[in-house]
Amino acid sequence: MGYRAHVCTTYRVQYGTGCFSAGACDAVNRLLENYEYPDGDGGRKSLVEYCDAEETVMELSREGLGSLVASLENGEAPEETDAVLDAGYTREDLISVFREWLDSSDKSHGFIRIEWF
């Protein structure tokens, strides 16, 4: 626990066209919230490190999202993937968006912050 609060001044949301439709929002959130990846000690860790009550702000483990991408590429998709596919997206769409998040997010952090709006 720290002794003083400090504000992060360099982390900003990149406004643009965004990813996924409103109809896929819940399905993508379920996929992210339920995915667990190996922690290196024989256990598993949650991909989502933080999620606000409205599920509009999420912080994802960079390592965990990379693990999810690898699983999708290897055909080892979690069952929650089906709901995203039913919303009109392909496995390749998921991989592409998640890779974009990995590539375009601030790499000085171990997490990736996404916001739904």
Model segments located where?
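Acidic (Asp/Glu-rich) sequence patches and key acidic residues
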Residues: M1-G110, W116-F117
